[in-house]
């Protein structure tokens, strides 16, 4: 992916870009690895790169010039609508103030990868489902469980045989994804989850057995990377965190069409 990014930032125009790498956790080496690779490749390509630490970052406007500053920086980094690209990394969605910084950059005209709306929709599994549904994409049947007492109504609405999948609306790395094999199990888990957090948001989905899932990255209307994550042995999930193996994956024509439509 980094090689494709390097090609992207050099092919569109000869002038230099100003690149912001926006991260909520720039000091965490494990979580910041991908962002750091963007920094390295951007600099190799001769671009100006600035890491924005969203905690405490501010934007100033003076003499028709916008600058963004980290809390520990007095010099800042000039930004504009004509030459600045922001690559948003890390858990920026965790705080509204972080997202508000993205909104400010968008208002200035900075090219955002990705925008606040995209991040918020992608972080919510049901909003993602609705958004993709708007474009006619094929998806597993999905129903919300709006509160603890409506799980049975939701199950009837799903109208799917067991096993099914239950998920928290937010979560990553396979956390909050549950394999449900009976009514007794779903009732017990719903009660448990609502007991732990009365504001928890849940959905249930039709279970479709597969040997893995496909991840695709689309940039500027082009597919720049694709991979397959194989199901972890003894599990139903294919997340890398619990040990899924990853390999290159050539997309079919239908998959290309669906991915571009989704993007």
Regions inferred by a protein language model and the residue ranges of each:
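Charge-dense, intrinsically disordered terminal/linker segments
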Residues: 1-17
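Residues at the starts of beta-strands that form the adenosine-phosphate
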Residues: 17-18, 48
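Active-site nucleotide/adenylate-binding loops and adjacent lid/helix of ATP-dependent enzymes
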Residues: 18-24, 35-36, 69, 80-81, ...
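Conserved N-proximal alpha/beta basic substrate-recognition cap immediately N-terminal to
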Residues: 26-141
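Short glycine-/acidic-enriched loop or helix-start segments at secondary-structure transitions
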Residues: 31-32, 97-99, 175-176, 214, ...
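Beta-strand scaffold of nucleotide-dependent catalytic cores
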Residues: 189-190, 205, 213-231, 262
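A long amphipathic alpha-helix within ATP-dependent nucleotide-binding catalytic cores
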Residues: 201, 206, 237-263
């Amino acid at each position: 992916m980094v090689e494709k990014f390097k090609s992207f930032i050099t092919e569109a125009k000869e002038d230099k870009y100003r690149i912001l790498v926006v991260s909520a956790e720039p000091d965490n080496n494990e979580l910041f690895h991908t962002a750091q690779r963007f920094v390295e490749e951007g600099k190799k390509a001769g671009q100006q790169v600035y890491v924005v630490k969203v905690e405490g970052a501010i934007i100033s406007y003076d003499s028709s010039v916008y600058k963004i500053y980290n809390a520990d920086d007095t010099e800042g980094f000039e930004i504009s609508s004509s030459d600045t690209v922001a690559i948003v990394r890390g858990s920026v969605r965790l705080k509204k103030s972080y997202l508000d910084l993205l909104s400010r950059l968008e208002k200035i005209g900075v090219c955002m990868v990705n925008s606040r709306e995209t991040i918020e929709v992608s972080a919510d599994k049901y909003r993602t489902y609705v958004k993709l549904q708007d474009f006619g994409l094929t998806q597993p049947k999905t129903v919300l469980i709006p509160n603890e007492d409506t799980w049975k109504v939701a199950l009837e609405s799903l109208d799917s045989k067991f096993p099914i999948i239950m998920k928290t609306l937010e979560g990553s790395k396979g956390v909050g994804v549950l394999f449900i094999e009976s009514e007794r199990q779903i009732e017990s888990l719903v009660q448990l989850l609502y007991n732990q957090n009365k504001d928890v948001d849940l959905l249930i989905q039709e279970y479709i057995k597969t040997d893995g899932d496909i991840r695709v990255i689309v940039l500027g209307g082009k597919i720049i990377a694709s991979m397959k994550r194989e199901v972890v042995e003894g599990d139903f999930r294919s997340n890398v965190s619990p040990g899924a193996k990853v390999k290159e994956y050539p997309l079919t024509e239908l998959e290309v069409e669906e991915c571009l439509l989704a993007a």
